[in-house]
Amino acid sequence: MISRIPHIPHTFIEFGVESYREANTRLLLKLRNWRGLVIDGSADYIQRIQSQDIYWRHFLTAECAYIDRNNINAIIQSAGFDGEVGLLSIDIDGNDYWVWEAIDVVNPAIVVVEYNAVFGDVQSIAIPYNPEFQRLNAHYSGLYFGASIVALIE
């Protein structure tokens, strides 16, 4: 996909990365030498990322923050990112829709957002915004989170 977009910036922002071992942007960093920002709410995960060779060998910034729609722009800007970016990846198992809607400090060429397939592909559904949202606290199954694909397309 990135090869089909002319003059795509070689920068990315990804949040909800956990240890960054299974991330949407990892190959862009390693194989294409993109510069990026990764964010996770767990200090342990961020410490793991910062101790990996991928962190010091590449242009990677790793920030520990619990993201909500009120702080996401400040987090992105304080890490030195604004304007055009190549890819934005959102996977926070909860307020993904609301956080994406709030982002206005970057303009990504490509956006990857986790959607909830349980909500189906017919109706526009998003969980109500709750800055304290925890997927497993919301419902024991862990299946109540995020938004339907229709909501994200709209």
Where are these regions (language model features)?
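SAM cofactor-binding core of SAM-dependent methyltransferases
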Residues: 1-78, 83, 87-90
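Conserved acidic-Pro-Pro-aromatic motif
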Residues: 27, 34-35, 83-90, 94-154
